[in-house]
Every structure is written in structure tokens, then in C-alpha cells.
Amino acid sequence: MIPRSGWVLLAGLGACGGSTPAPHAAPTPVSRVAETASAAEVDKVWEQATKAVRRGKWGDVIKHLDRALLEFPPGDPRVTQAHMWEGEAQFALGNNLQAAREFRKASDDTPNDPLAPEALLRVADAYADLWRRPELDPSYGQTALATYQELLNRYPGTTAAKRAQMRIDDLQERFAYKEYKAALYYMRLKAYDSAILYLKDLVATYPRSAVAPDALIRLVQAYRTLGYKEDVQETCGYIRRFHSTAPGVGKACPKGAETS
């Protein structure tokens, strides 16, 4: 069973010292440890977290990092890495929203840290992973797209930005496919005017998408069904100019038949 958050593990960690906790003050042992931990104790917790990361023991990673983050002194350089690792642990366990929060802390609390661009990339990745089926509500996909674009603006030229651009291209393909599926739905209902709206928006917004040529062909079919001869002629001219080798072009737009 995937745990809902690392805080449950943190509560268990606070009670692992061997003594019985006070019945009405469960958080207190953790707070006292955070206030009295020596540098050596903090280093030990960090070492435990590091080993857990290497072994892929994500529950242990969260447990040790939650404690370490409480005990780190202000300005400790390990804080950003701790949030990154906790984000990866939460992501691995399927807790995408918690992962996004941890990655966001790493990118926003220490924006000049070398890990900040990668952290922002992972924020977007966590949201993108929640939008796995294009036909579903695209809210998470839109959040992912906005975050990838934020990365391009904040950290242009970085390796993370280059990877973000690739992910943007993939998301745009998925958005285009979503529009295409909606258009086909209206085509099946013979609601051609509605289908045309989706197809035109797809072609205008995602002209380089893989489904754009087929969307244009479907647009011609809808125009022809409705008797929009000028639109057929104009769209066929566009198809021949930019997608002349796409499958189905010859059948959809035979030369000399645009106005038939």
C-alpha cells in the first residue's frame, strides 16, 4: 500500500528512541530532538538518508529526510538536496502532489542552487505524470506545461531547460490528440460545425503535431459535407503546400475537384 505522506513515517521516527512518549504531546519528542541534535547526529541521519536513496528504500528515505530537515541548522547546504531526494521518493511511491511540493521547495527556496533547474523540471514531471490519458481532464497537463515554460524562462540554456522543451513538445502532441479525439466525436454525431471548431483550433495551435495532417483532411471532409466549397479549396491548397506527402491527401484533395 502506498503511504499517503512521509509525515506518518516521521511520527514513528520520533518514538524510536526506546522511551515511552508523553500521552498528550506526540510531536514533542521530534521537536526536542531537532533543538538538541548535535552536528554528528545530524550527519548520521544524513548518512542514513543517503544510504536509503542508493538502495531505493523510499520509505526510509522519507523517514530520514523528514528528520534531517527538522534538524538542519539554518543555511545548511544539504537542504536543497534533501528536498530533491524527498521529492524523488514521493514520486517513486506515487505521491505526485507531495513530490511536486518538495521539488518546488528546492527550486523556489534556493533558486540559485545548481539543483534548482532540475528541481523545477521535476515539479512539471510530477504533474505531467498525473495526466496520462489525453481524453481526461487536462488540468494537470496544463499545470505541467506552464511549469516547463516557467523553467525555460527562469533557466534558459540549461540542460534542464533543453529537457523541458522536449517534454513541452510531447505535451503539445497530447493536447493536439485530445482536440482531435473531440473533433472525431462530433464528426460521428454529424455535428460538423462543432467538429470544424475543434479541427481549426488544433491546426492553428498545434500545426506541427503528428495529427495535424489528418485533422486537415477531416476538416476538408466536414467542409465538403456542408457544401463549403471555398473552404475546401483553401484548405486543400494549404494541405498541398505543407503536407503534400501525408497519407490520404490525394483522395481528400484530388486536383481539380476542390469545388466538387
PLM regions with names:
Residues M1-G14:
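Sec-dependent bacterial lipoprotein signal peptides
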Residues I2, C16-S260:
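Acidic, polar-rich low-complexity tracts and alpha-helical solenoid repeat scaffolds
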